[in-house]
Design a protein with these regions (language model features):
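Flavin (FAD/FMN)-binding glycine-rich loop and adjacent Rossmann-like elements that form
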Residues: 1-171
Length: 171
């Protein structure tokens, strides 16, 4: 809640204590851990043009990375009920995409999508119904997460908790 103090001008952004762990999602359907790995964004097109240079200030991510969860909401398009999206098309920003794009994380998301589709058919539930009342608990979402974990597709790293701020061992 210290962010409100920044908005009101009581403290500077530099005075905030930055989180030492990734965001925890109640609708997690998988996990990943990979360094941010940006491909260069070139000034001119085609990118192979001799003498072409990276666009200044475009690469970020020189900081530490932490394990992260894959939220189901990132797989559900806002206007299409009968589709789950994973892989390079998952709904993440370009910073997150630099880590999501590797195979092991795409496999985790793909396994989650397949399990979610099967679960939805078995229970007569649309995937969006599993997340529409977040952060409130949803019994069907909890059942899906139990199935994912039982199938060997974990939804959280050991000791994942909003109270655990010591993720230094995971860097």
């Amino acid at each position: 809640l210290r962010t409100i103090d920044v908005i009101r001008g009581k403290i500077s952004p530099q005075e905030l204590q930055w989180r030492s762990r990734a965001h925890i999602y109640p609708d997690s359907v998988g996990i990943g851990h990979y360094n941010l790995d940006f491909h260069p964004c070139m000034v001119e097109s085609p990118s192979e043009k001799p003498g072409n240079q990276e666009r200044p200030g475009e690469r970020q991510g020189a900081d530490e990375t932490y394990p992260f969860q894959i939220p189901l909401r990132a797989m559900i398009p806002p206007k299409i009920d009968n589709l789950l999206v994973t892989g390079k098309s998952i709904a993440v920003d370009h910073v997150s995409a630099s880590a999501y794009r590797v195979h092991s994380i795409e496999w985790s998301a793909g396994a989650a999508a397949g399990t979610t589709a099967s679960f939805a058919l078995e229970t007569g539930t649309m995937p969006y119904q599993l997340i529409e009342n977040l952060p409130r608990a949803n019994a069907n979402l909890e059942q899906l997460q139990k199935r994912l974990n039982a199938n060997g597709n974990p939804t959280a790293f050991p000791n994942t908790s909003i109270l655990n701020l010591n993720w230094k061992d995971w860097r």
